[in-house]
Amino acid sequence: VNDPAVLVVGAGPAGLAAAHELAVAGVVPVVVVDREATAGGVPRHCVHTGFGLQDLHRSMTGPAYARHLAARAIGAGAVLRLSTTVAGVTPDGTATLVGPSGIEEVRPGVILLATGARERPRSARLVPGDRPAGVFTTGQLQQWVLADLPVGRRAVVVGAEHVAY
């Protein structure tokens, strides 16, 4: 697809949901690009249940929810281009994509940024020093648990988001 109607940057929950809704509404072609090799964003690393309660009215693990969202977007007609990065956008709206098929320029009608949540490193928050051994961010902990790596036996949880429980 050389010139999509919409180029969605980010294949996490928001990007996949937007692609689905746009395709269902007849806005085609919709192309979703993501630098990761697998669609789904942060939920891919969350093995706990609770995903899908609001929109699907059932509880799923994060990876299952991510697969569901990707399949739904594709089923509606969206095209997923994974392992693909937007290297730049010119003033006229031409986007340079770099991925497994090489370098490609596309001129979408609209670029929708859905780049999601990212944990900021300490330096970005102006906190000096290194993280002590055994201190995990939420994302790190979820990745270790998903990979079945040992994370310790005692924990102190700082925070109140739903993954803290």
Can you say where each PLM-predicted feature lies in the sequence?
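Beta1-alpha1 glycine-rich phosphate/pyrophosphate-binding loop at the start
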Residues: 4-68, 72, 151-165
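FAD-binding core/adjacent interface of flavoenzyme oxidoreductases
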Residues: 1-9, 67-154
